[in-house]
Amino acid sequence: MAKFTPANLPAEFLDTMRDIMPSSLSMDDFIAACQRPLRRSIRVNTLKISVEAFLRLVQPYGWQLEPIPWCQEGFWLLNAEEENTRLGNTLEHLSGLFYIQEASSMLPVSALFHRNEALETVLDVAAAPGSKTTQIAARLDNKGAIVANEYSASRVKVLHANISRCGVSNTAMTHFDGRVFGAALPEYFDAILLDAPCSGEGVVRKDPAAMSHWSPESITEIAATQRDLILSAFHALKPGGVMIYSTCTLNKQENQQVCHWLQAQFPDACEFESLRDLFTDAERATTEDGFLHVFPQIYDSEGFFVARLRKTASVPPLPRPGYKVGKFPFSPVAPKDCVPLIQAARKQGIHWDETLLQLWQRDSEIWLFPAALASAFGNIKFSRIGIKLAERFPKGFRWQHEAVVALADPNANNAYALTDDIACEWFQGKDCYPEPLPTADELILTYQNTPVGLAKRINSRIKNSLPRDLVRDGASSAQQLAKE
């Protein structure tokens, strides 16, 4: 593993931190925390495996796991060390059983569902690489719908890959500047997560170069963008809805001041809700307004800021956008065609709740769209909605990998459980020669009781059909990694 090089903290930045740091905290402790490597942390993906089953699974691996107090699915991995750079290639990760996610970044979603908030439609304004989107999907248990937006074109592909790997079925993706949503979908969402682009002062333990372009002038520019984003998000939020505003930075200009600015625009419609009781010991990071201002030395984590805001009344709408969305390219599958399609899918071991996911088509493509988003179709351009289920051919259907990962029954008659060695070959893109041979010709392949793909048996060979962009030459089991 590469040697950790502490960040060079500018004197002006340290002066700013000294001015805003609570008297209960020490600057010496702050500097010491910033110059320590960040603890590796993971989140169990409960769409694939329960926390209890995951802990039983990894118990033989010798992982030293410490629970993260604000996320019951989250754990610090205390003895990561050399395997830090290889956790992403473990079978357990490639199968979607866990997500490598910094502990502080689990806070916003925990705050979103604080007091067991019941949510139907959620917007994740800046979603890539997908840690929070997949965390929201798990908390929703794939019910309702999420719009996962990402402005950066280079990060959209990564976002989709993580959504697919984790078996998320209730998400639609958009590729916009987040400032469009308030006008395009006014007062539409039950909840919004705005993890805003920021100066990144809190991430120096993970990325020492994060401070290389730090300046007061850049913070002023970023804060102006953040005000635009939070204003648009507030307009897109239903009356009674909740918004989480978060950053991975520490200065007040990008944090408290942005929230107070929004409240000043809508004094009769915007309330702050305290996060003091979000988890045991949360009061150590709680401000007078009930925000969480997490300096890195408090919980030995990244620096972070989280605010929870409630929209208490409707607000005057923004002007409608001038652009044209264009004709929606999909149409619902006719009821008479749904029955044989559903029967064919079930025969293959693929099941879904027809009240949550609805069949749509485009040419020969069959898709499953979240029913909760139907009213948004045609009002905004989506880059991808739900799950591509199949392609229709004269002799039947070609079922898609992402549908199998999200919807297949690991206990179906045609399911075949892979050993560690065979699973490694599968994720390395190789054909497999298992013993004993499976009896079915079309197989749902599983690993640790979760579906990882669909394959054909040809004589004694399982033909590898894993999409090429998912192939990992270094795929290995976590147990094998622990032995090395």
From Swiss-Prot:
One of its GO terms (molecular function) is RNA binding. GO terms for biological process: rRNA base methylation. It is an enzyme of class 2 (transferase). The active site is at residue 248. Keywords: Cytoplasm, Methyltransferase, RNA-binding, rRNA processing, S-adenosyl-L-methionine, Transferase. S-adenosyl-L-methionine binds at residues 126-132, 150, 177, 195. The keyword Methyltransferase applies. Its main location: cytoplasm. SUPFAM superfamilies: S-adenosyl-L-methionine-dependent methyltransferases. It comes from the Bacteria. PROSITE patterns: NOL1_NOP2_SUN, SAM_MT_RSMB_NOP. It is found in: Cytoplasm. Its EC number is 2.1.1.178. It catalyses: cytidine(1407) in 16S rRNA + S-adenosyl-L-methionine = 5-methylcytidine(1407) in 16S rRNA + S-adenosyl-L-homocysteine + H(+). GO terms for cellular component: cytoplasm. Pfam families: Methyltr_RsmB-F, Methyltr_RsmF_N, Methyltranf_PUA, YebU_pre-PUA_dom. NCBIfam families: nop2p, PRK11933.1. Belongs to the class I-like SAM-binding methyltransferase superfamily. RsmB/NOP family. Specifically methylates the cytosine at position 1407 (m5C1407) of 16S rRNA. This is Ribosomal RNA small subunit methyltransferase F. It comes from Pectobacterium carotovorum subsp. carotovorum (strain PC1).
